Structures are given as C-alpha cells and as structure tokens.
Amino acid sequence: MGQKINPIGFRLGINRTWDSRWYADTAEYGKLLHEDLKIRAYLIKELKQAGIAKVVIERPHKKCRVTIHSARPGLIIGKKGADIEKLRKKLSEMTNSETHLNIVEVRKPEIDATLVAQSIAQQLERRVAFRRAMKRAVQSAMRLGAEGIKITCGGRLGGAEIARTEWYREGRVPLHTLRADIDYGTAEAETAFGICGIKVWIFKGEILEHDPMASERRGLEGDAQGPASRERGDRPDRRRENA
C-alpha cells in the first residue's frame, strides 16, 4: 500500500509531523479546522508568485501563529514590511484572535516536492513541452542532493485528444520504507486543453539512522554478502534494501 497512500500521511508520527498543531474540544474542533482550510486557501491564492511550500498553523492559548515556508520571502514581506503587516491584519480578521506571522525561507526549492510541482505546472501553462519540464526538474533535484525523484503528469498532455499519464524517475524512491524521508507535492496546470495534474515524490535519504534496529539490520546484510564482496566494494542488492 506504500505505492498508493500519500507518503506524508503514511509517515505521520514516525518521521513527519502535522502542519496544523493545536488541540480543541469537540465543540470547537470543526470551526478551527475550517479556519485552517480558509487560511491556507487564502494564502495560496494571494501569494501565488511567492512559491509557498507549506503553511504551518499553531494555536497557543487564544492566539494563532502562522508560519509560511516560501521560496521568495521578499515578495511576502514587501517594502519595509508593509505587505506582511497587511497580511497579518487580514489573518487576524479571519481568526478573530491575535495572529503572529512568521516567514521561513526555503533554501533549496529544487528539492521541495510542492515547489517542484508548482514549477512544472507553471511551465505547462506557458506551453513548455511536458517531457522537457519533467527532465529539467529531475536533473536539478539530483544535482542538489536528492537521492531519488519521481514525477508524474496526467491529462491532455501536448493537447492530445485522449488523456494519459506520463512519468519519469531517477534514483531510488522507496515508498514502502518508513524510515525514508520522502517529500510529496501536487499541483494543477490550467492549460488551454484542460487541467493537467502533477505529482512529485523526492527521496532525501533515511532519517532514522540512530535507530539501533536499523543499524543491526544493515550489519546483518553486510555479513550476508561475505568479506569478498565487501573487499571488492560491490554495491548491496537494491531489492534487499527496499524489502
């Protein structure tokens, strides 16, 4: 099922955490959940050019703290902080509470799955060939340290009469390995022929390196290969790693 499920939801509580971090009783939960949805929809619509990777919402006692992860924080802050102050006031009106707004810069947008998907969507809307856009994104991600990346584009690609799905992968993307740090993002391209959907998976390495069970398992795998193969520097069987 690791191939089908959302990789981020699959790893919540293991090596990922939630984007909404607050607690509410039954009476308040629905109202606060809809507030979160409205805040995210508003920010993504208003700050489309700022490259929003994710929005984290925390709710300390009778307050709201919103953290925006952006590839271009200067567009959000504005000249002398004027734009960010307007944004903070708007969010305060939406939540009816004191709102703190934090901006975090995404240092490497080329290996952020959501930003990669948004970039491909923008290229498709400008009529760039989908294969060229996918291959360029894959090469940039691998150059900047990703261990693997997979991209799928679905829809009337190139204006074809029949919709189809094309995908491109480079490196390893072990979706069923829970210790793997896999980022996942989606975007939609509104082309002249209809909407095309883009999905991106990026494998950044294994997070639970300190896990004693993982270390012991790797040691057993090394012993199973025998000393001759280790002396030659043979690479371990990829199928065994993904098992």
UniProtKB/Swiss-Prot annotation:
Belongs to the universal ribosomal protein uS3 family. One of its GO terms (biological process) is translation. It holds the Pfam family KH_2. The keyword Transit peptide does not apply. One of its GO terms (molecular function) is mRNA binding. It comes from Agrobacterium fabrum (strain C58 / ATCC 33970). Gene3D superfamilies: 3.30.300.20, Ribosomal protein S3, C-terminal domain. Binds the lower part of the 30S subunit head. Binds mRNA in the 70S ribosome, positioning it for translation. This is Small ribosomal subunit protein uS3. Residues 214-243 are annotated as: Disordered. Residues 39-107 form the KH type-2 domain. Part of the 30S ribosomal subunit. Forms a tight complex with proteins S10 and S14.
